[in-house]
Regions:
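Hydrophobic alpha-helical transmembrane segments and their immediately adjacent juxtamembrane loops
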Residues: 53, 227-322
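Peripheral, non-transmembrane regulatory/ligand-interaction domains of membrane transport proteins
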Residues: 1-238, 291, 321-322
Length: 322
């Protein structure tokens, strides 16, 4: 679906135009066209392909979706793919995709499965005509910067979730629920990392070595995006390591609890084994057993059993088994 199609000259909005008028405006000096599509149909993308002479491989990637974040050059056109990540109202992490085609006199952005609008990007860019005057390279930076900035709230939410889980790990009664929550958190971290890591490498092409002509005037701005991605990469690595450690600590706590239960069971088994041993001795059917004929034999036997059990109980209690 077409969101908007606007022509700009010298950094200022020239006119809202129809797709069939694009070819007229891109011919004007110091003018470029910025087209935004959302969940575009095949027909819409193919129409833009003909209008801007886009490379068929890049168009194929934009149509099929589910692409790894990347930045590629096709002649005079720069093609970028980014993944978006955001939480739904039901606290599920969902991903979307933004594809950008940038040429010397046009910018085409296509967003698929992205709930958040990019209209704010256009509004902010139009408030800075001296920057928008730099052309499609600046527009590409503005869109990329907006997508990357939206990673920060997601990472902060993941950090808060991990802090909450860590606080519960050392509480009594460790349960499988904590392991499940940490495992799901690791999956979310991996999802965000799959969006950040490839994009970090891709943006690196725009700030190191040979820079595509479209981005020559905005190289320092892409450096800012690169720095943000580096910070996110570091934060995600730290989160993943902490989550792994949390699982290991959780399993260690579970092992310790099992060991404590085993020690208590072994201690009580030892106490009852001693009592059973005495009862078994005096329960043997021998005719010559002096204790059986003794008047105080029964009370004495009970006393010995009680004393033995008491001593064992004291020793186990002192050792921390009971």
């Amino acid at each position: 679906m077409l969101i908007n199609c606007v022509a700009y000259r010298d950094g200022r909005r020239l006119a809202d135009i129809q797709p069939e008028e694009i070819s007229d405006y891109v011919k004007l000096p110091d003018c470029f066209v910025w087209v935004a599509l959302r969940d575009a149909s095949t027909e819409e993308v193919l129409a833009m392909k003909e209008e801007f002479d886009l490379h068929e491989l890049a168009v194929e990637d934009a149509l099929h979706g589910q692409q790894r974040p990347k930045v590629e050059e096709y002649g005079d056109t720069l093609f970028a793919v980014m993944q978006t990540v955001q939480f739904t109202p039901t606290d599920e992490l969902c991903t979307g995709e933004v594809s950008i085609f940038a040429g010397s006199n046009f910018v085409l952005s296509i967003r698929n499965r992205v709930a958040q609008s990019l209209l704010g990007v256009r509004a902010r860019a139009e408030k800075e005509p001296h920057m928008l005057k730099r052309g499609p390279g600046f527009v590409m930076y503005a869109i990329m910067d907006a997508v990357v900035d939206r990673y920060f709230p997601v990472i902060e939410a993941l950090e808060a979730e991990l802090d909450a889980i860590e606080a519960q790990i050392f509480e009594p009664g460790v349960t499988r629920e904590n392991v499940r929550r940490v495992y799901e958190l690791k999956q979310r971290i991996t999802t965000v990392k799959h969006a950040v890591s490839p994009l970090l490498d891709a943006v690196g092409k725009l700030v190191r070595g040979r820079v595509p002509p479209i981005c020559e005037d905005t190289r320092e701005y892409f450096r800012d995006v690169y720095d943000h991605l580096e910070r996110m990469q570091s934060a995600l690595d730290s989160l993943r390591d902490t989550a792994t450690t949390a699982i290991q600590v959780h399993l260690s706590m579970a092992t310790i609890e099992e060991s404590e239960v085993t020690k208590r069971l072994a201690a009580w088994a030892g106490i009852f084994a001693a009592a059973t041993a005495f009862a078994g001795i005096w329960g043997m059917n021998f005719e010559v057993m002096p204790e059986l004929k003794w008047r105080w034999g029964y009370p004495a036997a009970l006393g010995v059993i009680a004393a033995t059990c008491g001593v064992l109980f004291w020793r186990f209690r002192k050792a921390g088994w009971l």
